[in-house]
Swiss-Prot record:
Keywords: Copper, Disulfide bond, Glycoprotein, Metal-binding, Oxygen transport, Secreted, Thioether bond, Transport. This is Hemocyanin type 2 unit e. SUPFAM superfamilies: C-terminal domain of mollusc hemocyanin, Di-copper centre-containing domain. InterPro entries: Di-copper_centre_dom_sf, Haemocyanin_beta-sandwich, Haemocyanin_C_sf, Tyrosinase/Hemocyanin, Tyrosinase_Cu-bd. Disulfide bonds join C55-C66, C179-C246, C336-C342. Hemolymph. The keyword Metal-binding applies. Its cofactor is Cu(2+).
Length: 413
């Protein structure tokens, strides 16, 4: 290609499985990218997501964030975005794809790859600030901050392996309708933004600044891996993994700012494939692949079997019709009996900011409540309320009036 590389596929590996040479190449590449002040440097690429805003076009008087959330093209926009960073890192010397941080498995510690403040390079007897530990936000003279919620990140499920993220992604992967999958998938992905950013403004938890934290690309490499896993499951289920059955017009609409071209997007590959429908064939178009497409050690066959096992009992879900509220938010909900006794039933997060593109899902986000109802001796036909509380990223209470009351959905086996 025009960068002097042959088109061999880069492999995206777990951050915990990188060889010393791979880790060194990534650290030096990101350090170099962060020092690159061109239109293809770190600050420019970070601005693709939200701030300084480039949409609807850079010369517009009133601009908003280009990143896609709350819409069917969320997976495709972020696939392009990881490619944008991956190609930039390769130009700066990386020999491996963007590694992924697998947060579906119970975490015992935070990976040193991004948690160590100092990078010690034993080969060259050098040490310097680890570029994956943070970054400057040049346009407003701030630095990325983290307020990591280790309680949620390290929390095992009742059986150990069945973490919050595992259960959320399993239900997303169960969906054979693309748009049903997308809603579940996107909300599941939001959790890591909230758990890494916490109550910090200049962080993963805020739509405007998330992409300035290098953890963003590690998280989105994993998010994209789970999207690729869904594609493999679709193939296994007899569907075309490169086709969707909904939002067809959106799939033909080029995604910004990738479609802009120079002087904003200098990457010819993401410009050429800026239509969402052109992102499905990621190996052919973007030349990367994953070391493992699995969830908690389950390959596609075993995952398919596990998903079918979940369907062998009657299930009850709480259904939420979500829309953007101009900020990131944490939602908790409880099941309340008619005598007033309430039991905590679940939680999820929304990623947002004042510059977000207005959005509203056209279908429900579903959260399973079968076990909570059983523990309280409730049947789906009994009378109970679902009570929501909503707080902003900085722990301010938010009115829940924006959302219609949750639905109760019964799914027989």
């Amino acid at each position: 290609d025009d960068q002097g590389h042959t088109h061999r596929n880069l492999v995206r590996k777990s951050v915990r499985n990188l060889s010393p040479a791979e880790r060194r190449s990534l650290v030096h590449a990101l350090k170099s990218l962060q020092e690159d002040s061109s239109a293809d440097g770190f600050q420019s690429l970070a601005s693709f997501h939200a701030q300084p805003p480039l949409c609807p076009y850079p010369e517009a008087n009133k601009r908003f964030a280009c990143c896609v959330h709350g819409m069917a093209t969320f997976p495709e926009w972020h696939r392009l975005y990881t490619v944008q960073f991956e190609d930039a890192l390769r130009r700066h010397g990386s020999v491996v794809g963007i590694p992924y941080w697998d947060t579906v498995v119970p975490q015992e510690d935070l990976p040193a790859f991004f948690n160590d403040e100092i990078w010690d390079d034993p080969l060259f007897h050098a040490n310097f600030t680890n570029p994956f530990n943070g970054a400057d936000i040049d346009f407003n003279h701030q630095k990325i901050a983290r307020d990591i919620n280790v309680d949620k990140l390290f929390k095992e499920g009742p059986k150990g392996y069945d973490t919050w993220s595992f259960k959320q992604y399993i239900y997303a992967l169960e969906q054979e309708d693309y748009c049903d999958f997308e809603v579940q998938f996107e909300i599941a992905h939001n959790a890591i933004h909230a758990w890494v950013g916490g109550t910090e403004e200049y962080s993963m938890g805020h739509l405007h600044y998330a992409s300035y934290d290098p953890v963003f690309i590690l998280h989105h490499s994993n998010t994209d891996r789970l999207f690729a896993l869904w594609q493999e499951l679709q193939k296994f289920r007899g569907h075309d993994p490169n086709e969707v059955n909904c939002a067809l017009e959106m799939m033909r609409e080029p995604l910004k700012p990738f479609s802009f071209g120079a002087p904003y997007n200098l990457n010819p590959t993401t410009k050429e494939h800026s239509k969402p429908e052109d992102t499905f064939d990621y190996k052919g178009h973007f030349h990367y692949e994953y070391d493992h497409l699995e969830l908690q050690g389950m390959n596609v066959q075993r995952l398919h079997d596990y998903i079918n096992q979940q369907k062998e009992r009657d299930r009850v879900f709480a259904g939420f019709l979500l829309e953007g509220i101009g900020t990131s938010a944490h939602l908790d909900f409880s099941i309340c009996k008619i005598d007033g006794e309430c039991t905590h039933a679940g939680y999820f997060d929304v990623l947002g900011g004042s510059l977000e593109t207005p959005w509203q899902f056209d279908r429900l986000y579903k959260y399973e409540i079968t076990d909570v109802l059983e523990s309280k001796g409730l049947d789906v036909h009994d009378v109970f309320d679902i009570k929501i509380t909503q707080t902003s990223w900085d722990n301010e209470d938010i009115s829940t009036d924006r959302f219609p009351p949750p639905s109760v959905i019964y799914v027989p086996k």
